[in-house]
């Protein structure tokens, strides 16, 4: 049974024994929550998530599109694939570059 992580996301249906899973392990999530698209799932239990956001240009009073890539832990019970829209939440540093964990697959991006 998956524990409540304090976010409004659906718990995964499958079980896993990953200690770094927020639902079945002991990893606490806190901080920022982002939505993005998985652009690479080649690493073991990790994904690269690309997110687009708007940045305001004060001089011209307009917005510009920006993009950033974030590395996130991909628990086996969630198992996000390339092209999936995912919700990631901040957690403690899991490695040198990973400070986020995938908490929900919100669909698949269609081109």
UniProtKB/Swiss-Prot annotation:
PANTHER family: 40S RIBOSOMAL PROTEIN S11 FAMILY MEMBER, 40S RIBOSOMAL PROTEIN S11-RELATED. The lineage of its organism: Archaea, Methanobacteriati, Methanobacteriota, Stenosarchaea group, Methanomicrobia. GO terms for molecular function: rRNA binding; structural constituent of ribosome. The keyword Hydrolase does not apply. This is Small ribosomal subunit protein uS17. GO terms for biological process: translation. One of its GO terms (cellular component) is cytosolic small ribosomal subunit. Pfam families: Ribosomal_S17.
């Amino acid at each position: 049974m998956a524990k409540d992580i304090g976010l409004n996301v659906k718990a995964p249906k499958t079980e896993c024994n990953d200690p770094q899973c927020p639902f079945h392990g002991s990893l606490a999530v806190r901080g920022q929550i982002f939505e993005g698209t998985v652009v690479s799932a080649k690493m073991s239990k990790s994904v690269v998530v690309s997110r687009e956001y708007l940045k305001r240009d004060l001089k011209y009073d307009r917005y510009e599109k920006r993009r950033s890539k974030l590395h996130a832990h991909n628990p086996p019970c969630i198992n996000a694939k390339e092209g999936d829209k995912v919700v990631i939440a901040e957690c403690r540093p899991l490695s040198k570059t990973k400070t986020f964990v995938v908490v929900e697959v919100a669909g698949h991006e269609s081109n």
